[in-house]
């Protein structure tokens, strides 16, 4: 087969693949896009040093969205009602010792637009849950504790991104 035929075939396959992906709604994750009416975001949590609050604010700043210290008429508000991590035993080995755990990260969030005196609810209080499994080796207990901390941090970062995607979708309605 000549180089020209291979090139044409490759281009045709690439075009067909691109068309198939775009027709199913797939697109690369890009920057967070908020409607023009929302110029800033206020993040409220019971604990001002909440790691989830900090992750959300960091993601907002990374997307060039202003984070404000109080709600205003042109801002959206993310209210973190609560978040928690739970560890569950997923499986045990033949000696009845834990071999796998499941970590569940849950967050309860509400999204509003506008200032406190003229607020409209974009998303009612909703609970989101993410989970991840990991293997546990009792001979490496110290490493397992570090692994659990890393996985918890990854789940929290994923939760922050999920909440911001919800904000973007709800704000466009």
Regions found by a protein language model. Give the residues of each.
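Bacterial N-terminal signal peptides that target proteins for export
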Residues: 1-13
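C-terminal motif of bacterial Sec signal peptides marking the signal peptidase cleavage site
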Residues: 19-23
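Bacterial signal peptide processing site
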Residues: 25-28
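Acidic/histidine-rich, surface-exposed loop or edge segments in extracytoplasmic proteins
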Residues: 36-44, 140-145
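Sec/Tat-exported extracytoplasmic proteins
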Residues: 60, 64, 111-115, 138, ...
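Surface-exposed short loop/turn segments
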Residues: 79-146
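C-terminal/domain-edge helix-coil "capping" segments
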Residues: 142-173
